[in-house]
């Protein structure tokens, strides 16, 4: 199930492997418990979501934001794309930013039209992303990985005073996210000639 897949993603990230997964709708909801752990442990995973309606009084396979909005509080940064070309261009931004900031990302797009649309796109070579990759951040991530050579304790129980301090200590990582995303979007814009920014004003 998706719950098991989320556990596998969490375990894989704990051992220093850069990991991603894809899901939608009810499947995303099953990942929520592990999403809290992944975000709380500052593991740079990425979940790609074709955003869809949730089954309530009936099942619906059409696009909606019910699933991703149910995950706002998990600690994952959220990046939305609105076309097949944007998915191509900005999925890489989600990965690059997650690695550089140690904050996991949820990259989502319309779960009916965009996810199933047959469209010509300009594909970027992986070398573009490779040149933008923060190798020091990858090294730091791998050095924090669980290994028999350097055992550590994780997932302990904390009293409220220590728990609060460790939660607050993560703010510096989250505060860096907007600038890092903007920087990577600017670099992707230079390569593609398509303008990207975290927020665009219309009106």
Which residue stretches match the model-derived regions?
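Conformationally flexible catalytic loops at phosphate/diphosphate-handling active centers
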Residues: 105-200
